[in-house]
Amino acid sequence: MGAAARSLRLALGLLLLATLLRPADACSCSPVHPQQAFCNADVVIRAKAVSEKEVDSGNDIYGNPIKRIQYEIKQIKMFKGPDKDIEFIYTAPSSAVCGVSLDVGGKKEYLIAGKAEGDGKMHITLCDFIVPWDTLSITQKKSLNHRYQMGCECKITRCPMIPCYISSPDECLWMDWVTEKSINGHQAKFFACIKRSDGSCAWYRGAAPPKQEFLDIEDP
């Protein structure tokens, strides 16, 4: 076999490998603070998944049916969203394309943030904030009622390594990855980035609503 033929076979092999790996690479998400997840979502609910089934959701450009997983849910509480309760949640059929797997049977409670689809439906992906309810801190649970919403005009900037800086007064530096090597660290569990009366934003700690003027860090 000549050098040209070997080069062609190698190129075709690499192309095939890239094609096979592409679906897994398609689901890539940047970590977000729980407050950012709340602010970015159309719908935020506490719910249980009762049942699941695969359904058709139209066709792709080639006429092939698009499959999705439909979860029938029992909504326990809505923190953000439409007036109508959410009855069904949809997601992609595989984690390779950002599909989410929920335990069904109505025993496990979740906090679920995602995009509204109207008429009691929403769509979720692995890039959305979906966690078991019992893993949230008490502060996080209470912040869902009002405090996260108060900070939606602020910008939370993740610090991947030292040094890192804010570029405007309405930013809060999220340091969990640097200080704890975790995106579920102290700031994620116990702090919210809230706008102050002078228009700047700062981290606030505590379950009670912030005072009109507050320090960067307050104890509960």
Curated annotation (Swiss-Prot):
Broad class of where this protein is predominantly found: secreted
Disulfide bonds: C27-C98, C29-C127, C39-C152, C154-C201, C159-C164, C172-C193
GO molecular function: enzyme activator activity; integrin binding; metalloendopeptidase inhibitor activity; molecular function inhibitor activity; peptidase inhibitor activity; protease binding; zinc ion binding
Domain of life according to the entry: Eukaryota
One GO BP: response to xenobiotic stimulus
Chain positions covered by the region annotation Involved in metalloproteinase-binding: 27-30, 95-96
Pfam families, sorted: TIMP
CC annotations in GO: basement membrane; cell surface; extracellular matrix; extracellular space; growth cone; neuronal cell body
Family annotation (SMART domains): NTR (SM00206)
Stored InterPro entries: Netrin_domain, TIMP, TIMP-like_OB-fold, TIMP_C, TIMP_CS
Keywords: Disulfide bond, Metal-binding, Metalloenzyme inhibitor, Metalloprotease inhibitor, Protease inhibitor, Secreted, Signal, Zinc
Residues the entry annotates as binding Zn(2+): C27
N-terminal signal peptide: 1-26
Domain NTR: 27-152
Location of the protein in the cell: Secreted
Keyword Signal: yes
Record's keyword annotation contains Metal-binding: yes
Site residues (Involved in metalloproteinase-binding), renumbered to this chain: N40, I61, K67
Family stated for the protein in its record: Belongs to the protease inhibitor I35 (TIMP) family.
PANTHER family xref list: METALLOPROTEASE INHIBITOR, METALLOPROTEINASE INHIBITOR 2
Protein function: Complexes with metalloproteinases (such as collagenases) and irreversibly inactivates them by binding to their catalytic zinc cofactor.
Name of this protein: Metalloproteinase inhibitor 2
Natural source organism: Rattus norvegicus (Rat)
Gene it is expressed from: Timp2
